[in-house]
Design a protein with these regions (language model features):
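Glycine-rich phosphate/pyrophosphate-binding loops
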Residues: 102-124
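Electrostatically charged, flexible surface regions
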Residues: 123-213
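Alpha-helix C-terminal capping segments
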Residues: 61-68, 96-107
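A cross-family phosphate/adenosyl-ligand binding-site feature
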Residues: 4-64, 71
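Short beta-strand segments
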Residues: 15-17, 51, 77-80, 111-112, ...
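Short, structured loop/turn "capping" segments at alpha-beta junctions
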Residues: 69-72, 108-110, 139-146
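Glycine/threonine-rich flexible loop motifs
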Residues: 83-92
């Protein structure tokens, strides 16, 4: 959906991980080779799959595929399954890619939908993609620019609008469950819950999402 929407207004070079990369943050690959596989190559759209992390994808796009060529006007990543509010920004592969784009001094945006279902309906996000992209491209929002866009999992008519806000200071209370595999070997499974340390603050991303923004 992100490609289909952006393609309406721009030429696209897409370099995306070939597998899900949740929780990869700003990880890069140092101990194995990276490969690119061409998926689509047609006028206005080139798509490649990479066996690396989201940040690897941005790096290889800038430092290999566009070396000596015109730099892009914008870097966009997503659409992420689930929230990238609060401390989740630091763990997010989606936002890792967007932040990496900012390191190249290119305006960058990461999109997320608060729905973890594999068959999540991203239609709600779609209506905000182009308006936010146009704003990032045409208004002086400062440089480097990296926007973290989170959309609540609500019907479109229930979303109250776009609210610029700061990052919540909450964090995860982590619990490692000790389990055993079929051969009797112990292993650990990360669980836990998010603790909002400033629930009364009305200027944070957590508040905005819980209140339909």
């Amino acid at each position: 959906m992100l490609i289909e929407t952006l393609r309406q207004e721009a030429r696209l070079l897409v370099v995306a991980p070939e597998q899900a990369q949740s929780g990869m943050g700003h990880a890069i690959t140092l101990t194995r080779p990276l490969y690119l596989k061409k998926v689509t190559d047609e006028p206005g759209l080139s798509v490649y799959a990479c066996n690396g992390t989201p940040v690897d994808c941005v790096k290889i796009a800038f430092d290999c595929m566009m070396l000596g060529k015109e730099m892009p006007s914008l870097v966009v990543s997503g659409i992420n399954h689930g929230s990238n509010s609060a401390i989740n920004v630091l763990y997010s592969g989606t936002m890792g890619a967007a932040i990496e784009g900012g390191f190249y001094d290119i305006p960058s945006i990461g999109f997320s939908l608060l729905d973890h279902d594999e068959d999540a309906d991203f239609g709600t996000v779609q209506q905000y993609i182009l308006p936010i992209v146009r704003k990032a491209m045409t208004e002086n929002l400062g440089r480097p620019l990296c926007l973290n866009v989170n959309v609540p999992n609500l019907p479109a008519e229930q979303i109250r609008g776009i609210m610029p806000c700061r990052q919540n200071r909450g964090y995860w209370r982590e619990v490692f469950e000790r389990r055993q595999d079929p051969r009797g070997h112990d292993y650990y499974w990360l669980c836990g819950y998010f603790e909002n340390t400033e629930p009364e603050a009305t200027d944070t991303d957590e508040w905005a999402l819980k209140n339909g923004y």
